[in-house]
Structure formats: C-alpha cells, structure tokens
C-alpha cells in the first residue's frame, strides 16, 4: 500500500518535498539527503507525519 509522505529538513524544519512510499517494504521513517532552498545546501530530510 503506497502512502504520501512529507520530507522535512532536519536543520531548518522546512517541509520541502512530498513523496510516496510503500509501507510494506519501508515500515520505518525514511531519511534522505536532499537540497534545502532555505539553507542553500544539501541536508538530511526526514519523513514527517
């Protein structure tokens, strides 16, 4: 079952990206290194509710 998730920057807290994930394959929260516009650099983004 695919669900929509939001990815938030760990440094500034901005919610920059919306993605989808398969809950059956990825039960835990996703962490990806993505570009943050506010910080103007690549930072770690975590899945939020």
Swiss-Prot record:
Gene3D superfamilies according to UniProt: Ribosomal protein L33
GO biological process: translation
Keywords: Ribonucleoprotein, Ribosomal protein
SUPFAM superfamilies attached to this UniProt entry: Zn-binding ribosomal proteins (SSF57829)
InterPro entries tied to this protein: Ribosomal_bL33, Ribosomal_bL33_CS, Ribosomal_bL33_sf, Ribosomal_zn-bd
Molecular-function GO terms, alphabetical: structural constituent of ribosome
The UniProt record lists the keyword Ribosomal protein: yes
GO cellular component: cytoplasm; ribonucleoprotein complex; ribosome
Pfam families in alphabetical order: Ribosomal_L33 (PF00471)
Tree of life domain: Bacteria
Keyword Ribonucleoprotein: yes
UniProt family annotation: Belongs to the bacterial ribosomal protein bL33 family.
Name of the protein in its database record: Large ribosomal subunit protein bL33A
Origin species: Bacillus cereus (strain ATCC 14579 / DSM 31 / CCUG 7414 / JCM 2152 / NBRC 15305 / NCIMB 9373 / NCTC 2599 / NRRL B-3711)
Gene name tied to this protein: rpmG1
């Amino acid at each position: 079952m695919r669900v929509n998730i939001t990815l938030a920057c760990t440094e500034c807290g901005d919610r920059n990206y919306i993605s989808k994930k398969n809950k059956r394959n990825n039960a835990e929260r996703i962490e990806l290194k993505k570009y943050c516009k506010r910080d103007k650099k690549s930072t770690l983004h975590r899945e939020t509710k």
